[in-house]
Amino acid sequence: EWAPVDLAVEAGNLAKMPVIVDFGGNNPPLSIEELFMKHLRKGDIYTHTYTLLEGNVRETVVDTATNKVKSFIWDAKKRGIIFDVGYGGASFNFTQAIPSLKAGFFPNTISTDLHTGSMNASMKDQLSVMSKFLLMGMPLPEVIRASTWAPAQVIQHEELGNLSVGGIADIAILNLREGDFG
């Protein structure tokens, strides 16, 4: 059952790159604790961190009985596993995100997982996902970092995601406004 993950990690070793794992769909679900502690390396990426899929096809980061982040999730983060949002169409659930953020468990990277099935749902674009994390209590500097510099570092392209002399210019000027916009 672990062969696809192990082969991906082996390819990552050969390429000297992290792997990103979209994990789930096994019946019964494989353990994410085992994934983090026995299969992934420091710097490997776990996406769809805050998902809660129907049918119990993927283990969650928050224990649904206690509403607390599972202890091994904290251990995995300390070990260097990168936790990515990967918002997508069905890959994000506030019942996982809110308790996580309240406990101080912020994602390392914020991404959209934009595809034809997700672009016309609650996730429109990167800024809408960033706004949700800001509103859930993630500090603005951390939201910006998790959307720019942190992903560039994770994928080993430090010429991206920052403002520096000689850096690649990809700049957005944002205005933080309060109000009712829905």
Q: What are these model-derived regions, one by one?
A:
Residues 93-176:
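His/Asp/Glu-enriched, well-ordered alpha-helical/loop segment
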Residues 82, 88, 134-135:
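C-terminal amphipathic alpha-helical segment
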Residues 1-83, 91-108:
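Histidine/acidic residue-rich metal-binding segments in metalloenzymes
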Residues 178-182:
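Short, Lys/Arg- and Gly-enriched loop/turn segments at beta-strand edges
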